[in-house]
């Protein structure tokens, strides 16, 4: 795979020695729910913006880049560490739960040109994709991604495509029924969007198994033997020639770190992570119930510990994206 000099420059800005240790704080709908669980009434704009600022101030010195949204995160972009790169999201949060299509939608007041002008070093877009889903729906999704890829090509800025797999007939992605399908769903979507017509530079993906059902990782029911889980990671590596990074999917910091060791041992040559809730989630109840100062203390201690431990794991497990580009 080859990229332009400008795209390479931007990728270098969001990584450290080819490893992407990025902090994800583009959550909007999920963050509102987390905040609402600890107070009466909905979270305010000020509450959301302030927590994003706190996280950016305290944790970006230890991350190669931070992922933020232009809806609530622009203030946070102003206080990140100088050497830390910036990814901005282009998609609206959430999806229409009344239909199985989960069609994508851009933030209507933004374009790649405007996100770049706001300081982005890369653009991230999230797509829900069922590789076995309705053919017409998938054609619409593919065309949508082609448009975004073309925008990023025109602006000469890296395109990070986040793929979240699902099955149109299964409502619970954490179920045993979906766990059996997950390797095929995750790896199949990666294969589709690795085609150069989509203009994707880096894939942000799920691990291809639900670790809660892997032999040795669960005390409950097992749906993958160790050998089956290893094969799923090997198939993932074979599914794309593009650099790819893992998302934390809201699991605990400990499980995410253990997963990265397992993935690397299986042969997955991932180039880093975009890790969100596994790093900062514990700050939310502290911020809501005890205020800014206590939240800052949590971020400086437990938040720092989470990100520092993750960085150490990445040093041992991740492969530089420069090996693929």
Curated annotation (Swiss-Prot):
Q: What biological processes does GO assign it?
A: 6-sulfoquinovose(1-) catabolic process; D-tagatose 6-phosphate catabolic process; lactose catabolic process via tagatose-6-phosphate
Q: Entry's InterPro entries?
A: Aldolase_TIM (IPR013785), DeoC/FbaB/LacD_aldolase (IPR002915), LacD_aldolase (IPR050552), Tag_1.6-dipho_adolase (IPR005927)
Enzyme Commission number(s): 4.1.2.40
Q: What class of enzyme is it?
A: lyase
Q: Name one GO molecular function term.
A: tagatose-6-phosphate kinase activity
Q: Does the keyword Lyase apply?
A: yes
Its annotated pathway?
A: Carbohydrate metabolism; D-tagatose 6-phosphate degradation; D-glyceraldehyde 3-phosphate and glycerone phosphate from D-tagatose 6-phosphate: step 2/2
What the entry lists under Gene3D superfamilies is as follows: Aldolase class I
SMART domains on file: DeoC
Going by the UniProt record, its keywords in alphabetical order are: Lactose metabolism, Lyase
Q: Which reaction does it catalyse?
A: D-tagatofuranose 1,6-bisphosphate = D-glyceraldehyde 3-phosphate + dihydroxyacetone phosphate
Looking at the record's lineage, which domain of life comes first?
Bacteria
Q: Which HAMAP family match?
A: LacD
The family annotation for this protein states:
Belongs to the aldolase LacD family.
- Name under which the protein is recorded: Tagatose 1,6-diphosphate aldolase 1
**What high-level taxonomic lineage is stated for the organism?**
Bacteria, Bacillati, Bacillota, Bacilli, Lactobacillales
């Amino acid at each position: 795979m080859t990229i332009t000099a400008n795209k390479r420059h931007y990728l270098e800005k969001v990584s450290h020695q080819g490893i992407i240790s990025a902090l994800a704080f583009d959550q909007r709908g999920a963050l509102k729910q987390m905040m609402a669980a600890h107070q009466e009434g909905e979270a305010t704009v000020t509450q959301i913006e302030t927590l994003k600022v706190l996280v950016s101030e305290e944790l970006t010195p230890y991350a190669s880049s931070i992922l933020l949204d232009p809806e609530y995160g622009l203030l946070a972009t102003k206080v990140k560490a100088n050497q830390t790169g910036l990814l901005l999201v282009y998609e609206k949060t959430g999806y229409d739960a009344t239909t199985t299509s989960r069609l994508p939608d851009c933030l209507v007041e933004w374009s790649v040109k405007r996100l770049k002008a706001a300081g982005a070093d890369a653009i991230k877009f999230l797509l829900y994709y069922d590789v076995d889903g309705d053919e017409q729906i998938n054609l619409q999704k593919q065309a949508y991604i082609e448009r975004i890829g073309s925008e990023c090509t025109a602006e000469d800025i890296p395109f990070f495509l986040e793929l979240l797999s699902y099955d149109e007939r299964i409502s619970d992605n954490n179920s045993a029924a979906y766990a059996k399908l997950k390797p095929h769903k995750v790896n199949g979507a990666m294969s589709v969007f690795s085609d150069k017509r989509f203009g994707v530079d880096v894939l942000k993906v799920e691990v291809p198994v639900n670790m809660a059902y892997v032999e040795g990782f669960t005390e409950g029911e097992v749906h993958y033997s160790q050998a089956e889980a290893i094969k799923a990671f090997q198939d993932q590596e074979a599914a794309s020639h593009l650099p790819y990074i893992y998302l934390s999917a809201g699991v605990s910091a400990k499980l995410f770190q253990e997963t990265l060791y397992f993935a690397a041992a299986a042969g997955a040559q991932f180039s880093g992570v975009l890790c969100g809730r596994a790093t900062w989630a514990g700050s939310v109840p502290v911020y809501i119930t005890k205020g800014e100062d206590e939240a800052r203390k949590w971020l400086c201690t437990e938040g720092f510990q989470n990100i520092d431990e993750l960085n150490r794991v990445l040093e041992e497990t991740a492969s530089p994206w420069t090996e693929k580009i």
